[in-house]
A protein has these predicted regions:
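Flexible "stalk/tail and boundary" regions
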Residues: 1-8, 12, 22-78, 82-83, ...
Length: 143
C-alpha cells in the first residue's frame, strides 16, 4: 500500500526520484500512464488488475474501446535506477501539466504524481467530501 505526500522535483532529463518508502515495491518496475489529471505509477500486479477490469468493462459496453486503447498506448514501463529515479515521458508530463515541482502521493495500490496547484485543488474537494462522508456515517469513519 502506498500512503503519504512528498514534495519532489523532476530533473532536466524528465526523471523523478521516488520517495524511499515507495521504492521497494517498485524495484522490479512499474507502469506509468496518465490517470485523472495526474501521472499514475502502478506496480505490475495492479496494472494487470486494471487491464482485466478494463477488458471486462469494454466487453460489457461500459467503457469505450478507444478510450482503453489510448490508456494503454500512452503507458510506459519503467524500472527505477540505482538512485530510485524513474523516467516520466514528455507526452505524459505535458498531458497533465507537470513542470519541475511535483507532489508525489500514495493512493492505495498506486502512486500519483501531481502538479502542486492541481493537487491542492483536489485535496480541498476531497477533504470536504471525506468530512461529509464521516458525518453521514459512511466511508473511513464507519466502524
Amino acid at each position: 500500500m502506498f500512503v503519504g505526500n512528498h514534495e519532489h522535483t523532476i530533473d532536466d532529463k524528465g526523471r523523478l526520484i521516488l520517495p524511499s518508502s515507495f521504492r521497494a515495491r517498485l524495484a522490479d518496475g512499474a507502469y506509468v500512464t496518465t490517470l485523472d489529471q495526474c501521472i499514475a505509477i502502478v506496480p505490475p500486479d495492479e496494472f494487470a488488475r486494471m487491464a482485466d477490469r478494463l477488458d471486462e468493462e469494454v466487453s460489457e459496453g461500459l467503457v469505450d474501446v478507444n478510450a482503453v486503447r489510448v490508456f494503454f498506448s500512452q503507458a510506459d514501463f519503467v524500472t527505477p535506477d540505482t538512485q530510485g529515479r524513474v523516467r516520466l515521458l514528455p507526452h505524459l508530463r505535458e498531458h497533465v501539466g507537470l513542470e519541475r515541482s511535483v507532489i508525489v502521493t500514495g493512493y492505495n495500490r498506486r502512486i500519483e504524481v501531481w502538479d502542486p496547484e492541481r493537487f491542492a485543488e483536489r485535496t480541498a474537494v476531497g477533504t470536504e467530501s471525506l468530512a461529509d462522508a464521516i458525518t453521514r456515517g459512511r466511508g473511513v469513519g464507519r466502524t
